[in-house]
């Protein structure tokens, strides 16, 4: 009597799952205008979460802590005390 021992193997390898492979979109935070740059009223100066930079003279703070210019002028990033920074906009005189 003839006995055959047949073994069948998968023709596709089993594929495992992974819990990696996704990331959130960057929020494009940070300085939008440079120190000493001329800015117009309404220009966004700094996008941030929390108050890393505080609003100074002629600078407003939006609901998401974004800093924006209230008047036309020159932007200056300054120290505020020992451990804080602020952004101010100083109007330039007409010549």
Curated annotation (Swiss-Prot):
Q: Which SUPFAM superfamilies match?
A: Ribosomal L27 protein-like (SSF110324)
List the transmembrane segments.
Answer: none
Look up the record and give one Gene Ontology term from the biological process aspect: translation
One short Pfam name that applies is Ribosomal_L27
The propeptide segment or segments lie at 1-9
Q: Superkingdom, according to UniProt?
A: Bacteria
Sorted keywords for this record are:
Ribonucleoprotein, Ribosomal protein
The record describes its post-translational modification as: The N-terminus is cleaved by ribosomal processing cysteine protease Prp.
Entry GO MF terms? structural constituent of ribosome
Q: Name one GO cellular component term.
A: cytosolic large ribosomal subunit
NCBIfam families noted in UniProt: L27 (TIGR00062)
Q: Which family does it belong to?
A: Belongs to the bacterial ribosomal protein bL27 family.
Annotated PANTHER family: LARGE RIBOSOMAL SUBUNIT PROTEIN BL27M (PTHR15893:SF0), RIBOSOMAL PROTEIN L27 (PTHR15893)
The name this protein carries in UniProt is Large ribosomal subunit protein bL27
What is the species of this protein?
Answer: Lachnoclostridium phytofermentans (strain ATCC 700394 / DSM 18823 / ISDg) (Clostridium phytofermentans)
């Amino acid at each position: 009597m003839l006995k055959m021992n047949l073994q069948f193997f998968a023709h596709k390898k089993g594929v495992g799952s992974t819990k990696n492979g996704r990331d959130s979109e960057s929020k494009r935070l940070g300085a939008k205008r440079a120190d000493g740059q001329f800015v117009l009223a309404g220009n966004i100066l700094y996008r941030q979460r929390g108050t890393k930079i505080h609003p100074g003279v002629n600078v407003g703070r939006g609901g998401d802590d974004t800093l924006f210019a209230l008047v036309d002028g020159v932007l200056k990033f300054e120290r505020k005390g020992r451990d804080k920074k602020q952004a101010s906009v100083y109007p330039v005189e007409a010549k």
